[in-house]
Regions:
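Nuclease and nuclease-like effector domains acting on nucleic acids or nucleotide cofactors
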Residues: 2-94, 102-165
């Protein structure tokens, strides 16, 4: 049998892509896969606009996408393999913004939304607590908007340990 040169490169490359993008971060199942969910920001929210956007009471609810959007996305992501150990029960996850709306995350970008598990130690409830703290710190000027966003895109668990504990 004659095989075209390089056929094994295609197979190896395809296998590497599958291996390189697991459903969850290798660091911790409470962190999203950084390839699938790198985070995205709302361009309207900048350091100079925080007092007319995120620091205004009710801002987050004014930009939050409808539940019909986030629930449909959660089901697509879970069915598409973005789940923890094959668990596709939607009730085990909260469709969450990696960069929270409270610090100017994009409301609807799939790069900023992921099915965050409730069933792990570092779960949606803990991240919610950090979101509230970082929002307060940005609005009172204790940290910059860029710093707050980095807390979530780098490793929100370390951010929790630094700012919430």
């Amino acid at each position: 049998m004659i095989r075209p040169r390089g056929w094994w490169i295609v197979v190896a490359t395809a296998a590497a892509v599958i291996v390189a993008t697991p459903a969850w971060s290798a660091r911790n199942p409470g962190l999203p896969n950084p390839v699938r969910t790198p985070g995205a920001v709302n361009a309207r929210v900048t350091q100079s606009t925080i007092h007319s956007t995120i620091c205004v009471p009710g801002y987050s609810s004014s930009v939050r996408p409808p539940e019909s959007y986030t629930e449909a996305l959660k089901y697509r992501q879970l069915d598409g393999g973005y789940n923890l150990n094959g668990d596709t029960r939607a009730s085990d996850y909260e469709e969450d913004h990696l960069i929270p709306l409270e610090v100017g995350g994009s409301p609807t970008s799939v790069k900023n939304l992921w099915p965050e598990p409730w069933t792990v130690t570092w779960n949606a409830g803990r991240k919610d607590a950090l979101e509230n703290v970082m929002h307060r710190l940005v609005c009172d000027g204790s940290v910059t908007l860029a710093t707050a966003r980095r807390v979530f895109t780098s490793n929100w668990i370390l951010g929790y340990e630094k700012y919430v504990h």
